[in-house]
């Protein structure tokens, strides 16, 4: 009986350590604001919405995006307005996706631009579920206004929060 209890405690401690590590990696910024700001292009200001071809919380792989990747709500990704796609590297099937800096509500995040949209007039970017949860953890807003989106030069950015 003692062995089962100690094994359960060890398992719980390991699970806690893993969850703390994951939580820290969510918060820890890989790129500094200064580096990102010097590597970014002209800003576009507008509204951002969230998209998921299924329903919020769905974790299965979705349909293919414009870049050919499968939609994944767990990565830092977004779809840029079709009329802006050239500014963000073309977003074409089989072409390496480009990256953008998205700023809103006092936060910054780097997202991979791997799809085109939104189709709703007045919106410039559709954030996937993970990126939108960074700005709106409850997903209650649906749309965030006064979002600043800047294309990032180069192909080797690590998507996620910017410090």
Residue ranges of each PLM-predicted region?
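Secreted/periplasmic proteins
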Residues: 6, 18-163
């Amino acid at each position: 009986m003692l062995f089962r209890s100690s094994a359960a405690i060890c398992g719980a401690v390991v699970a806690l350590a893993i969850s703390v590590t994951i939580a820290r990696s969510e918060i820890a910024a890989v790129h500094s604001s200064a580096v990102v700001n010097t590597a970014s292009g002209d800003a576009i200001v507008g509204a951002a919405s969230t998209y998921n071809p299924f329903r919020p919380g769905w974790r299965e792989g979705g349909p293919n995006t414009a870049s050919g990747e499968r939609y994944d709500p767990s990565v830092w990704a977004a779809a840029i307005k079709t009329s802006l796609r050239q500014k963000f590297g073309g977003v074409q099937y089989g072409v390496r996706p480009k990256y953008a800096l998205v700023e809103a509500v006092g936060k910054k995040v780097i997202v991979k631009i791997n799809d085109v949209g939104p189709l709703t007039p007045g919106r410039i970017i559709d954030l996937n579920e993970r990126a939108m949860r960074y700005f709106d953890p409850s997903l209650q807003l649906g749309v965030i206004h006064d979002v600043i989106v800047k294309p990032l030069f180069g192909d080797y950015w690590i998507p996620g929060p910017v410090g």
